[in-house]
Amino acid sequence: MVSAVSDVRYFWHETPVPAGLEVTQVYGWLLCPRTGRVLVQDDDGTFNLPGGTPEEWDADLTATLVREAFEENQVRVGETAYLGYQEVHRPGRAPYAQARMAGVVEAFAERAPDPDGGRVYRRLMTSLEAAPGVLGWGEPAVLQAGAAARVARARWRLPVDSPSEPGYVD
C-alpha cells in the first residue's frame, strides 16, 4: 500500500525490515486486554501511537517500544508482536523504516511528564476500527490496525471486535 503526504511516500509491508534499511521509529498498537481498545496518545489534540526512536542501549524493537510507552504514557507493556514496517521515501534522504508492533497493556501507572520534553500526554482508548481516523494517517494506518486486530484475536484472544466505548484513562 502506498500513501503520500506532500512529497513523502509511505509503503506498508507485513514483513521483516530488510537488512540495511535504517529503523528510525518503533510505534505500538497497545491494547487493553479487558476492553479491547487501543491506546492513542493525545498531545493537546495531536494524536499519535506510543513509541519513539530506537536508542543504542535498547536490546531490540520490543525494548524500544516498552521503554517509550512507559516514558510517554506510563503504561507497562506485556506481550508484544511485530506487525511490519512502514517504508518512508522522503526527497533528499535515503528510504528508511518505521517499525510497527502490537502489544498488551498490563498496567496503567499514574500519568507523569515525558522525560524527553516534559509533556504529559492524555491516554485515549478507542477501537482499532476508529483509531486510524483519529490518527489521520490514511490507508497505511487502516492496514496496520488490521494487522494488530489479527494478532490480538489469534494470539491473545482480545475482544477487539466488540470493544467498550472510547474514553480517556487519565
Identify what each model region corresponds to:
Residues 1-27:
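Acidic, metal-coordinating catalytic segment for phosphate/diphosphate chemistry
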Residues 33-71:
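Conserved Nudix-box catalytic region and its N-terminal flanking loop in Nudix hydrolases
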Residues 116-170:
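Nudix hydrolase/Nudix homology domain
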Residues 20, 106-111, 145-152:
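Glycine-aromatic-enriched surface loops/turns that form tight recognition elements
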Residues 23, 33, 93-96, 118:
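A generic fold-level signal
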Residues 75-84:
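A short coil-to-beta-strand element that immediately follows conserved catalytic motifs
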Residues 30-33, 103-105:
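Active-site beta-strand termini and strand-to-loop segments that position acidic
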Residues 87-111, 124:
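Active-site-adjacent beta-strand/loop module that shapes the phosphate/pyrophosphate-binding cleft
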